[in-house]
Amino acid sequence: VLGLKENLAGSVAYTAEEVKNVTWLKARGYTASIMDNNPYNYAVQKSDKVTVKELMPRLGEYDYLAIEWGYREFPASKNAYMDREALWKTFQGYSAGYMFPVSQGIEVRAGDLSSEPLKTLGYALNN
């Protein structure tokens, strides 16, 4: 959909505590990319008082950036170079991890859910 590719790095953008925090989840969801392919948030505990909505995947921060990068138009620009410069200015404040995701490597795995996989797994086992 919209050209989004698998992004297993989406979940490692957030810590184990962030993926359990109801305020964080309402604002950002539990992964930076829906293309991380994590079916639900298994780290949340009953005591976290998270609703079902926050347990389900949704578009994340990376997804919005990728869609804007691929589809944004610059009506005032005169050439592709000006478009590229405008895009770089737009994304200056974002982490390089959002700009160039890694989908393979020791840092990322399918189903890892956070940057702290052992801590997150501990939460899951408590459920």
Predicted stretch roles:
Residues 11-127:
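Conserved catalytic/binding loops enriched for acidic/polar residues
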Residues 1-13:
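Catalytic Zn2+-binding segment of zinc metalloproteases
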